[in-house]
Curated annotation (Swiss-Prot):
The gene is GHR. This is Growth hormone receptor. Residues 353-388 are annotated as: Disordered. PROSITE patterns: FN3, HEMATOPO_REC_L_F1. A motif (WSXWS motif) lies at residues 240-244. InterPro entries: FN3_dom, FN3_sf, GHBP, Growth/epo_recpt_lig-bind, Ig-like_fold, Long_hematopoietin_rcpt_CS.
């Protein structure tokens, strides 16, 4: 092996004389070394022990220096002195000749220093290390790429503040830029990085790069010692320079608390207990105010209350007791005359029959028991301007009472009929000079007595209709035409509430009319019974023919109730075919209106009467049905 190495060295040494300069020799040596290793892998050189470049740096971008390591000697042979050669490329890309290092001393041992005369910032450099003419190491670079500023100088710190607990403190660290860096002219722009740690720790805490020469450091523990370092780099570069000298920061203890461990305020524990306490208080409040809150959210439904009635009766379902209480309670009784502020009542003494013709007829008329006609209800009083005090409710009550006792008073019916006849002729008893007073034959009186003995059934209409028929007979008399203005006097009021009117002067007809009317009514009542709704055919035929046999100067016009009264057309046709009584009346004149309906009460002494519709003779039947109304009946009757 040593022989092969010796032969190779001699060959190389001999060939080196044929080249001028050292560059080809170094290249040949390098290629020869690789060739020997490829031929014999076991043959190795000591290239791994040769010197290497460690770094090249420019502190201020105006000068730069390069450093390398020492060579390691193995065996008896040494490499010889180490030399550095450099070259620069021009703009055209041509490489200049190699030149040796200008200064091996200024930058220190194993270094080469290039001052500003040998430094070009924008021109690339290539350097190499040689030993005994052989190239050991080489590299190429530009000055901009190797800029590494010097460490900052003059580091110090200032205490900013201490926390309220005295555990932490804040400081401000200051320094100065490297003196050889042209910062003021802007030839270089530096960025600084600060790192700190506690003395006994190994991990450094780095802060973000800054452009200023001061930076605050927060939350340093009191009574601890810290190490602070600062380094710089050119902006937009990756290569930091060397760290500055270590700055030691010692914060004195400000209070009695020891700073061995951090004191953390138990915020989480306080929040948990606070929420729990608020929840307990809320539940206590809701429990204590449960009823009040329930009433606010769900107000109770008011229970229906009736004055004077125990609500328990309604709950238990005792409706009989509730109805009994409502019936006897004053506040639930029906109130009459609710719309009238005051009501006048005129008392009528009907217990003294001897005094019936005495006193004011108008006072009797204004009593509360005489009104039944519907034309008088609801008419306003001329004096007070209010509605009449004669209400239909009270009158209907009286009429119902009369209808109820009608069946039980059959014994007193003849006396009542006789009393009505007396009332009709009340104003004619004192007419002694009347030519008709003696005209009433004595043979007619037994008929009246016979009618009283037969106990006739109740008439289909009430006492008012009977009185109406009597009054109509009197008005139909031609002799009473001169006295029609005096039919505003009330002779009497029947127990059933009917009003009996009489002329103001003596009637010339005398008692004959009264007797004949009473006899006619007795005959009609003696033959048939009439109800409140209908007339039968047979009864109508019996009652209607009576009129032609009465030989007086007036005719009796049948008057029927206007409500629900019907008779057959066959009976009316038969009756209408017979000769009427008007044919036998000598000197008949125009019929006189029947003033038996009170229109309005002007004063206690004055009445205004309504005239009923006059019968129109010669009317024919217009209806072809089996029944006709009472209006049509009154028009066609003779």
């Amino acid at each position: 092996m040593d022989l092969w190495q010796l032969l190779l060295t001699l060959a190389l040494a001999g060939s080196s004389d044929a080249f001028s300069g050292s560059e080809p020799t170094a290249a040949i040596l390098s290629r020869a070394s690789w060739s020997l290793q490829s031929v014999n892998p076991g043959l190795k050189t000591n290239s791994s022990k040769e010197p290497k470049f460690t770094k090249c740096r420019s502190p201020e971008r105006e000068t730069f220096s390069c450093h390398w390591t020492d060579a390691v000697h193995h065996g008896s042979k040494s490499l010889g002195p180490i030399q550095l050669f450099y070259t620069r490329r021009n703009i055209q890309g041509q490489t200049q000749e190699w030149k040796e290092c200008p200064d091996y001393v200024s930058a220190g041992e194993n270094s080469c220093y290039f001052n500003s005369s040998f430094t070009s910032v924008w021109i690339p450099y290539c350097i190499k290390l040689t030993s005994n003419g052989d190239t050991v190491d080489g590299k190429c670079f530009s000055v901009d790429e190797i800029v590494q500023p010097d460490p900052p100088i003059a580091l110090n710190w200032t205490l900013l503040n201490v926390s309220l607990t005295g555990i932490h403190a804040d400081i401000l660290v200051r320094w100065e830029a490297p003196p050889n860096a042209d910062i003021q002219k802007g030839w270089m722009v530096l960025e600084y990085e600060l790192q700190y740690k506690e003395v006994n720790e190994t991990k450094w805490k780095m802060m973000d790069p800054i452009l200023s020469t001061s930076v605050p450091v927060y939350s340093l523990k009191v009574d601890k010692e810290y190490e602070v370092l600062v380094r710089s780099k050119r902006r937009n570069s990756r290569n930091y320079g060397e760290f500055s000298e270590v700055l030691y920061v010692t914060l004195p203890q400000m209070n009695q608390f020891t700073c061995e461990e951090d004191f953390y305020f138990p915020w989480l524990l306080i929040i948990i207990f606070g929420i729990f306490g608020l929840t307990v208080m809320l539940f206590v409040f809701l429990f204590s105010k449960q009823q009040r809150i329930k009433m606010l959210i769900l107000p109770p439904v008011p229970v229906p209350k009736i004055k004077g009635i125990n609500p328990d009766l309604l709950k238990e379902g005792k409706l009989e007791e509730v109805n009994a209480i409502l019936a006897i309670h004053d506040s639930y009784k029906p109130e009459f005359h609710s719309d009238d502020s005051w009501v006048e009542f005129i008392e009528l003494d009907i217990d003294e029959p001897d005094e019936k013709n005495e006193g004011s007829d108008t006072d009797r008329l204004l009593s509360s028991d005489h009104q039944k006609s519907h034309s008088n209800l609801g008419v306003k009083d001329g004096d007070s301007g209010r509605t009449s005090c004669y209400e239909p409710d009270i009158l209907e009550t009286d009429f119902n009472a009369n209808n109820i006792h009608e069946g039980t008073s059959e014994v007193a019916q003849p006396q009542r009929l006789k009393g009505e006849a007396d009332l009709l002729c009340l104003d004619q008893k004192n007419q002694n000079k009347s030519p008709y007073h003696d005209a009433c034959p004595a043979t007619q009186q037994p008929s009246v007595i016979q009618a009283e003995k037969n106990k006739p059934q109740p008439l289909p209409t009430d006492g008012a209709e009977s009185t109406h028929q009597a009054a109509h007979i009197q008005l139909s008399n031609p002799s009473s035409l001169a006295n029609i203005d005096f039919y505003a006097q009330v002779s009497d009021i029947t127990p059933a509430g009917s009003v009996v009117l009489s002329p103001g002067q003596k009637n010339k007809a005398g008692m004959s009319q009264c007797d004949m009317h009473l006899e006619m009514v007795s005959l009609c009542q003696e033959d048939f019974i009439m109800d409140n709704a209908y007339f039968c055919e047979a009864d109508a035929k019996k009652c209607i023919p009576v009129a032609p046999h009465i030989k007086v100067e007036s005719h009796i016009e049948p008057s029927f109730n206007q409500e629900d009264i019907y008779i057959t057309t066959e009976s009316l046709t038969t009756t209408a075919g017979r000769p009427g009584t008007t044919e036998h009346i000598p000197g008949s004149e125009m019929p006189v209106p029947d003033y038996t309906s009170i229109h309005i009460v002007q004063s206690p002494q004055g009445l205004i009467l309504n005239a009923t519709a006059l019968p129109l003779p010669g009317k024919e039947f217009l209806s072809s049905c089996g029944y006709v109304s009472t209006d049509q009946l009154n028009k066609i009757m003779p």
